[in-house]
Amino acid sequence: MANVKFQVKKGDLVKIIAGDDKGKTGKILSVLAKKSQVIVEGCKVAKKAIKPSEKIPNGGHINKEMPIHISNVAKVEE
């Protein structure tokens, strides 16, 4: 696959233009270039189960941002 340039990068402020979180704005936490997806702070939050470990002896649930396709976000000019 060829190197693809995206119009957005980590730290940019973007607005969600499609999907369940349409209209929300947030900062990009990371860009997944190979999948053409971005993770936006506070958008598309899912509850994930955590197995017990030394850090979290009881396990539990956490809220985690899930990736959004790059075509569903638009850069917001500040």
UniProtKB/Swiss-Prot annotation:
Disulfide bonds: none
Keywords for this protein: Ribonucleoprotein, Ribosomal protein, RNA-binding, rRNA-binding
Database matches in InterPro entries: KOW, Rib_uL2_dom2, Ribosomal_uL24, Ribosomal_uL24_CS, Ribosomal_uL24_KOW, Translation_prot_SH3-like_sf
Signal peptide positions (record): none
A Pfam family assignment: KOW
Biological processes, Gene Ontology terms: translation
GO molecular function, one term: rRNA binding
Transmembrane intervals: none
Domain of life: Bacteria
Cellular component, GO annotation: ribonucleoprotein complex; ribosome
Function: One of two assembly initiator proteins, it binds directly to the 5'-end of the 23S rRNA, where it nucleates assembly of the 50S subunit. One of the proteins that surrounds the polypeptide exit tunnel on the outside of the subunit.
Subunit: Part of the 50S ribosomal subunit.
UniProt similarity note: Belongs to the universal ribosomal protein uL24 family.
UniProt protein name: Large ribosomal subunit protein uL24
Origin species: Campylobacter curvus (strain 525.92)
Encoding gene (name): rplX
